[in-house]
């Protein structure tokens, strides 16, 4: 629906139609709410992303009814991890989650999940950029939008869900603040034609070298998109903190990494559609909720500090936030919900990610970690967000214990109120 035909009021207004926002709109509509799903873009549109879908993300897509659809795309068995003289093929562990992952370009994925939201009853609103809010005391009563002609209009709402991505412009209006004292990501990706677009393993190179051969605190990836696509998503990501900035030229690094993989992956031609982004990670944001509004997905910093993945968290938070709708005040309830689901894991993960930015840590720890298949299997499970509260094995118990201890040491735990 174009902005000119926008409804003047709704029960639930969702701003941002990525995976998180569209999931929230779908679940809210299925729960019987009147929903408007707004986005600044006109779909289909691209987003900077590695396009990888972990088994946890596949499980959420199953719940939305997209299981058959996603399995009709690339299907991978696990991770091929390489670096420091070693290479391992590490299958997804299965168990509570599917034993496979996928990779779907965001242009296609986001459009399809948005269709599910619309089919569930949400009203779409395209080309509408949220620029301000109206309030009555501590409640948001309406969002002010601008259309393509810079004409303003408003949509009144009883509940507001903000899913406008890593930059979260509407979140900033509402008081969201990103704290860069813990690790954040600096990443770039593009697409290349590859003779191995149907490879059954996503690949990560954990010994990422800069254009001068220097070791960087990050990794490179190659995610096959399937034989029909004929392409792979190729990218690089590094970690940084306010004290230890990344200091890399992403475009040059992406080109160098692509050239290094060219023969191995039978890559032809230049990188297509290169794009980059900064990624707040591990709940390193404050101001994620108010009386009748909440931030979800990337806007809330729900990104894994160890690999930059956020689609599964986006889909989950889009589903979980609907449980708040009967509460009168979300300002404390939503941060508490996020901490309950992700706080411990985010705390220890961003602490480990911060260590990787220390110059001497990775050269010492990298070769030791890559030597052990058992250790890398544990790393896959942790990096893939595949440890749940229901798991009772040694790895799960150790990870949760480490997370609880880490939170106690945090100056600013994940999802702090201010």
Model-derived features with residue positions:
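C-terminal helical "tail/cap" subdomain of flavin- and related membrane-associated enzymes
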Residues: 323-418
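Beta1/beta-strand and adjacent pyrophosphate-binding region of the FAD-binding site
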Residues: 5-20
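Conserved Rossmann-like nucleotide-cofactor binding loop
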Residues: 20, 43, 167
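Glycine-rich FAD pyrophosphate-binding loop
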Residues: 29-49
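Predominantly flavin-linked oxidoreductase catalytic cores and closely associated redox partners
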Residues: 116-264
């Amino acid at each position: 629906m174009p902005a000119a035909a926008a409804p003047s009021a709704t029960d639930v207004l969702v701003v941002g139609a990525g995976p998180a926002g569209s999931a929230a709109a779908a679940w809210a509509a299925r729960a019987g709410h009147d929903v408007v799903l707004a986005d600044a873009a006109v779909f289909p549109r691209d987003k900077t992303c590695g396009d990888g879908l972990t088994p946890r993300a596949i499980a959420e897509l199953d719940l939305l009814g997209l299981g058959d659809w996603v399995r009709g795309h690339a299907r991978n068995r696990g991770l091929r991890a390489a670096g420091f003289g070693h290479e391992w093929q590490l299958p997804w562990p299965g168990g509570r989650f599917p034993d496979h992952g996928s990779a779907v370009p965001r242009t296609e994925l986001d459009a399809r999940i948005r269709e599910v939201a619309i089919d569930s009853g949400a009203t779409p609103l395209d080309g509408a950029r949220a620029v301000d809010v109206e309030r009555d005391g501590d409640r948001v009563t309406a969002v002010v939008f601008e259309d393509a002609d810079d004409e303003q209009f408003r949509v009144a709402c009883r509940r507001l869900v903000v899913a406008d991505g890593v930059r979260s412009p509407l979140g900033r209006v509402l008081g969201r603040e990103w704290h860069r004292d813990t690790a954040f990501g600096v990443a770039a990706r593009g697409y290349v034609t590859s003779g191995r677009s149907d490879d059954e393993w996503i690949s990560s190179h954990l010994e990422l070298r800069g254009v001068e051969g220097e070791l960087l605190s990050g990794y490179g990836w190659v995610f096959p998109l399937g034989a029909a696509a004929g392409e792979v998503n190729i990218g690089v990501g590094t970690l940084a903190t306010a004290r230890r900035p990344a200091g890399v030229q992403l475009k040059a690094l992406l080109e160098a990494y692509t050239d290094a993989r060219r023969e191995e992956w039978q890559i032809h031609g230049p990188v297509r559609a290169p794009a980059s982004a900064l990624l707040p990670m591990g709940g390193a944001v404050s101001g994620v909720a108010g009386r009748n509004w909440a931030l979800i997905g990337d806007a809330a910093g729900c990104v894994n500090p160890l690999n930059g993945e956020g689609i599964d968290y986006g889909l989950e938070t889009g589903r979980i936030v609907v449980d708040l709708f009967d509460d009168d005040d979300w300002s404390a309830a939503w941060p508490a919900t996020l901490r309950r689901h992700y706080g411990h894991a985010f705390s220890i993960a961003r602490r480990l990610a911060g260590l990787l930015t220390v110059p001497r840590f990775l050269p010492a720890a990298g070769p030791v970690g890559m030597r052990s298949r058992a250790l890398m299997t544990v790393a896959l499970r942790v990096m893939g967000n595949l440890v749940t509260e229901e798991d009772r094995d040694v790895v799960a118990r150790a990870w949760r214990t480490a997370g609880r201890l880490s939170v106690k040491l945090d100056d600013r735990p994940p999802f702090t109120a201010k």
